[in-house]
Regions:
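Residue-level detector of extended alpha-helical repeat arrays and alpha-solenoid scaffolds
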Residues: 71-72, 107-110, 140
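Beta-propeller domains with acidic blade repeats across secreted/periplasmic ectodomains
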Residues: 1-62, 70, 78-81, 156
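Hydrophobic core positions within HEAT/HEAT-like alpha-solenoid repeats
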Residues: 76, 111-114, 129, 144-145, ...
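Structural signature of alpha-helical solenoid repeat scaffolds
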Residues: 80, 115-118, 148
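An alpha-helical repeat/solenoid feature that recognizes helix-turn-helix modules
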Residues: 107-119
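Amphipathic alpha-helical scaffolding segments comprising HEAT/armadillo-like alpha-solenoid repeats
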Residues: 53-61, 84-100, 121-133, 152-165
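Short inter-helical turns and helix N-cap capping residues of alpha-solenoid HEAT/ARM repeat scaffolds
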Residues: 67-68, 105-106, 135-136, 168-169
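Extended, hydrophobic alpha-helical segments in both membrane/secreted and soluble proteins
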Residues: 9, 139-150, 157, 161, ...
Length: 172
């Protein structure tokens, strides 16, 4: 799915019939032709283009709530590229503090804040602990991976990893 909400299909079909792993070396392989299909719903507007370029950090942090994955990812890239890790951690903590507890997407927003810190390698143990205790198992699973990655920089890494290892959901 593209940033506009359309589905894109890349069709680079090759007529080579080959049962080897090196078909990409075949001299008859077509390297120059292909099609990209763009599927949209008729009479439906496309997703609005988010403001990434020229946006200040508060607007970018708010983009972490976007329903579009591409928008959330681009906002994180921009924040990490233009700010120091400790600044990114402060932004993530501020974002989390402003979240509504009864928001149905609360755990996904927590996950996005932790992902922002992870992209910047801004170790934030309080946020990590909070995501490890989230209701959504996908957020807890992500937090477990981050706890493993940051284990050498966390004071309570064994405790956090033990919490994840004893989780009730098998994907965590």
């Amino acid at each position: 799915i593209g940033p506009d909400g359309a589905i894109y299909i890349a069709d680079f079909y090759n007529t080579i019939i080959c049962h080897q792993d090196d078909y990409f070396r075949d001299p008859t392989r077509d390297l120059h032709h292909g099609r990209i299909w763009r599927l949209t719903v008729k009479d439906q507007p496309l997703a609005p283009r988010p403001k990434i370029e020229g946006a200040d950090w508060t607007e970018l942090v708010e983009q972490l709530k976007s329903p579009e994955r591409w928008t959330r990812q681009q906002a994180k890239f921009k924040l990490v590229r233009h700010h120091k890790p400790f600044q990114v951690a402060d932004m993530a903590i501020g974002f989390v503090e402003d979240l509504e507890k009864d928001d149905p997407l609360h755990d996904r927003h927590l996950l996005e804040a932790l992902a922002l810190c992870a992209m910047a390698e801004a170790v934030e143990p309080r946020l990590l602990e909070r995501v490890l205790r989230a209701k959504d198992h996908r957020a807890r699973a992500f937090a477990a991976r981050i706890a493993g990655r940051w284990h050498d920089r966390l004071a309570n890494a064994p405790g956090m990893l033990k919490l994840a290892a004893n989780d009730s959901h098998p994907l965590v």
